[in-house]
C-alpha cells in the first residue's frame, strides 16, 4: 500500500472516530432525553457544573450549564461580581484541551458538521478570514461588557448573547419546549422570531460553508482560541520534515495555515 492510500485510510478512520466522539459528547451533554416529552428542563445538581461546549441551559435534556450563559448570569446580576469559578473552568479546559473542545466535544459544532455533509455546492471561506475576528468582538461586547454595563432599574443586565444572538438557545430550548408546552408556546413573541431567523441563517450557511458560526461568531470558541498558544493539546509542525508544500493549509477546513500559525 503506497503512502497516499495509507493517508486516505488514516483520514477516514480519524473522521469516523471523531464522529463517534462528537455523538457521545452530545449525548452525555444532553443525557436527560425523556425531558423532551415533558416540556420542562432538568434542574438537578448537574446544572451547577458547566459543560465545555456550547449547549443551552434551557435544553430539556441538558445535563449541565452553558459556560457562556452562566458567566453572563453572574456578571449581569444586581450584585455584579466577576465569575472566578466559570472563568477558571474555561481557563482550565482551554489549557488542557484548547479548541479540541470545538472539534470534538461541542454539540453545536457537531450539528454544523452534519449540515455541511448535505449534498450540494460548497463555498470556501478562505477569502473571508477577516471575519474570524468578529467572534472576539462578540465575546467582549455581548458576553462581558453589555451584560455588566447595560442594566435595568434594579441593576440587573440581560444575558445579551444568549438572549439576542445564540442560535443554540432557540434550537435546543425554545423549539422543543414550546412544541410540548402550550404555555410557553403562547408566550412566544418577536424575540423568538428574531432568533429563529438567526438559526435559519446559520443552518443555511452551515450547508454552504464549513462551520461558519464557529469561525465567525462563537464567543466560546474565541475564548478557547486565546488559550491555544498555551494549551497542552495542540498541533506541532516538524520543521525538519515540512517541505512547505501548502497542502495542509489547502486541506484545513478551518482556514488555518498550520505552517505559520498551527495554534492560532
Q: Where would I find each of the regions flagged by the language model?
A:
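Non-ligating segments of multi-cofactor redox enzymes
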Residues: 1-263
